[in-house]
Amino acid sequence: MKRNDPCWCGSNKKWKHCHYPTKPERPLDNLRQLYASRYDIIIKTPEQIEKIRKACQVTAHILDALCEAAKEGVTTNELDLLSRELHKRHNAIPAPLNYGHPPFPKTICTSLNEVICHGIPNDIPLQNGDIMNIDVSCIVDGFYGDCSRMVMIGEVSEIKRKVCEASLEALNAAISILEPNLPLYEIGEVIENCAAKYGFSVVDQFVGHGVGVKFHENPFVAHHRNSCKIPLAPGMIFTIEPMINVGKKEGFIDPINHWEARTCDHQPSAQWEHAILITDSGCEVLTLLDK
């Protein structure tokens, strides 16, 4: 690294005017302090990582069971009741329950068709042709896991199938580039390019986020094109959860329940989510189900 190169910390200053002579291969304690002070990002310790890994696996197992139970004729309230049973079985706490203002009333989010995210379970049976995102967030021994998946009910339309596939493809494409020192904005670039292949749009009202010690931490991970140059570092844990719309990217919040976000043109939306750890050589998908 040369003195006139941009500093590895993402400050947009030259290395000689910033962290010179400290190189990117810096001691982990220094890295942890730097990211806490500069970005308010928690670089997790090995002990924290192990506990977050456990929370993420519990979260993934609960999500898998809920997706298996999501069938035509089942209500999302019934899925919420199953979620409560599964959380108890795993000695886990559902993070969404009573979270926020107004308090979220259920243990999971179930977002159908044109609902972008934060759908509230209800007594309406699932119908043939529905697509649904189930979002599960668990607290296990004080640490958090977070992931979501799309479910297709019966025979769905070609456009609904495509938007589900596009969201998953965008998530996997973003994960494939993750490594230390990658600028955060590269994630949004990859996702935008993936959505554009299908002629779809990327929601920019909601973002991924740091997770593990808290439910929502820094950094906020934009899925659209942006200019965030924070470099990824080993020990960072965050979600990537691209929300892809068939039509326009804009959505609106339900004026009655103040939670559900819907597409403004009532076109379908899809989302997949994983929690990911940045490692020394790449990344680990913590919510990838280990059966």
Swiss-Prot record:
Source domain of life: Bacteria
Signal peptide: none
Catalyzed reaction equations: Release of N-terminal amino acids, preferentially methionine, from peptides and arylamides
Enzyme Commission number, as recorded: 3.4.11.18
Positions annotated to bind a divalent metal cation 1: 135, 146, 273
SUPFAM superfamilies with a match to the protein in the record: Creatinase/aminopeptidase (SSF55920), Sec-C motif (SSF103642)
Cofactor: Co(2+); Zn(2+); Mn(2+); Fe(2+)
Cofactor remark from the record: Binds 2 divalent metal cations per subunit. Has a high-affinity and a low affinity metal-binding site. The true nature of the physiological cofactor is under debate. The enzyme is active with cobalt, zinc, manganese or divalent iron ions. Most likely, methionine aminopeptidases function as mononuclear Fe(2+)-metalloproteases under physiological conditions, and the catalytically relevant metal-binding site has been assigned to the histidine-containing high-affinity site.
Sorted UniProt keywords: Aminopeptidase, Hydrolase, Metal-binding, Protease
Pfam family, one: Peptidase_M24
InterPro entries: Creatinase/aminopeptidase-like, Pept_M24, Pept_M24_MAP, Pept_M24A_MAP1, SEC_C_motif
One of the GO biological process terms: proteolysis
Gene3D superfamilies: 3.10.450.50, Creatinase/methionine aminopeptidase superfamily
Binding, a divalent metal cation 2: 146, 209, 241, 273
GO cellular component, one term: cytosol
UniProt-listed PROSITE patterns: MAP_1
Entry keyword Protease: yes
CDD domains: MetAP1 (cd01086)
Binding, substrate: 118, 216
Gene Ontology molecular function terms on file: initiator methionyl aminopeptidase activity; metal ion binding; metalloaminopeptidase activity
NCBIfam families on file: met_pdase_I, PRK12318.1
Family statement: Belongs to the peptidase M24A family. Methionine aminopeptidase type 1 subfamily.
Role of this protein: Removes the N-terminal methionine from nascent proteins. The N-terminal methionine is often cleaved when the second residue in the primary sequence is small and uncharged (Met-Ala-, Cys, Gly, Pro, Ser, Thr, or Val). Requires deformylation of the N(alpha)-formylated initiator methionine before it can be hydrolyzed.
Record's subunit section: Monomer.
Name of this chain's protein: Methionine aminopeptidase
Protein's organism: Chlamydia trachomatis serovar D (strain ATCC VR-885 / DSM 19411 / UW-3/Cx)
